[in-house]
Amino acid sequence: MSKRWAAGVQQLAWMAFAVAAMALTGCDGFFVPNVPVPPVTTGNYVYVANTVTNSVSGYAVATGTTGTATLTAVPGSPVSLQYTPVAMAISRSNKFLYVSSVGSINVYSIGSNGSLTATNGTGVTAINVTSMDVSPDGQWLLSLGGTSVLAQINVYQINASTGALTLTNTGQTSVANAVIVPRMLRISPSGTLVFAALGTGGDVVFNFDTTTGTLFNSQNLAVSATTSDNGLAVDNATANLYIARSGTGGGVRVFRIGTGGSLSEIARSPFASGGQAYTVVLDSTGKYAYAANRANSTIYGYAVGTGGGLTALDGSPYGSGLQVSSLDIDNTGAYLLAAASGGKPDLSMYSFDTTTPGMLIPAASVTMGTDPAGSMFVVAMHSGQ
């Protein structure tokens, strides 16, 4: 695997980062915690990117008893776009929503009632962005994009007042004898590691300096040409990485995270998900994991055991919308949200059974005026925990 980095990065900077990385990592699976920034905007809002109607829909989540809740459209929803949304991320302050297209990242301010307002002059040009994430300290937005031969991660510094983005660093990597299909990027809760799923190109791990925004490529996981790594989740302790994989050897694969981001697959991995896992998410406690299977429109649920191993939950898999594509947890930790590109419904919300812990119970759903709306992504506000 060859590595090409943005011009202007000096050798001395790399040496300094290597020393810093050694200080940040200790024994296997241990990382110095990165203190998350507390949210400024309160409220429990979720946003859905619709690729057929070229819009973003916002909903307020109202808590009810187990199995009951409401999703109410926020004022001005849906917001019509002049482009097709490709990915979304919310700032750690919950003040800004970032929405990418094939050529740019656009910034919207989030009102106290969840409404969205475009912010003039704060967007940036960015090519083929497929996934974004914001660092736990709230300083950085990272985007994943690229081509079939080159994956690229851009690092942007976030202006806390305006949400404006300033490009500070770029990391590029190619994978020998593989076709890269950039899928998902996730920053670890520790803030020091960045993971990127590259479809049939496997996965790549970067060390990340949260002071300077510098990336340093550390490891690549190769897969066969008939395998695609699509989604990622990292547990709260930055101890285990969960990969949603489809094709040959499909399922949820679990890797122990070691020193410097080194990965080693745990025993019994992969864990069954119907062979076509597209995305994966952990609940707020880290005790349960959920994987979306686009092929059969279901969500597989698991209890997370010691060492990160998974055991199927009672009633799993659970029915969802057609071609369920994206999962997230609301900022209270009480609900799982699922967006389905095939609709029927476009957005589903589940509560967690108290009698059978972890089991999903349908709580609310939304079928939009145009169904399917192509609801590919759902993002929820941060809890600040």
Each PLM stretch: what is its role?
Residues 2, 17-49:
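Bacterial Sec-dependent N-terminal signal peptides
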Residues 40-42, 90-94, 134-137, 187-190, ...:
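Residue-level detector of Asp-centered blade-edge/turn motifs that repeat once per structural unit
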Residues 51, 102, 145-148, 158, ...:
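Short loop/turn segments immediately following the C-termini of beta-strands
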Residues 342, 346-351, 355-357, 361-385:
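Blade-level signature of beta-propeller repeat domains, shared across WD40, Kelch, NHL, RCC1
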Residues 84-89, 127-133, 179-186, 227-233, ...:
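Repeated scaffold domains used in trafficking and secretory/extracellular systems
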Residues 58-69, 107-115, 155-164, 205-214, ...:
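Short loop/turn segments immediately following beta-strands, especially the blade-tip
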Residues 72-80, 117-124, 167-176, 216-223, ...:
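A short beta-strand motif characteristic of beta-propeller blades
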